[in-house]
Amino acid sequence: MGRDLDDVDRSILYLLQEDARGTSAKAMSDTIGVSASTIRNRIDQLEDDGIIRGYHPEIDYEAANIPLQVTFVISAPPTELQDYSEQIRGIQGVIDVREMLTGQRNIHVHVVGTDTNEITQITDAIHDTGAKIESSEVMRQRHVQPFNHFFLQGTEDMDARDDAVDKDDNSATE
């Protein structure tokens, strides 16, 4: 079981999900209201606890001239789920493998390729593992957003303070 996160941890996670590369500890400290060293220490602890497992770029595959993205839904025996998942992760062009907790359609695989020949090769490689492809869908677009449970703590208070400052500024000019 994981550990409980406080408001600072959740705020850090939210900001890192928005922009992990462009968000400095100083900028986060200004937004969250704690010191930059506290931010760095918390990030180190979140990494040590395995909550933050990495920092990954969001790639526009079409802009990288890899225009085809396909999602495969696969059935695998529950007792062999991890074995199939591991084999499939080793296939070139596979970028995401998700193991489902329930149901027969228990592996979802996201792949990319430059053309239908590459997608066919990936399909054949998946079949070679012994897994059964139940369906496949060509993906048009993928949208990712920060998990809203990791909302930025105190933003409501900061908005209220900004509104109060705006009112004070307006009353001073009247």
Where are these regions (language model features)?
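A compositional/biophysical signature of low hydrophobicity enriched in polar/charged and small residues
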Residues: 1-174
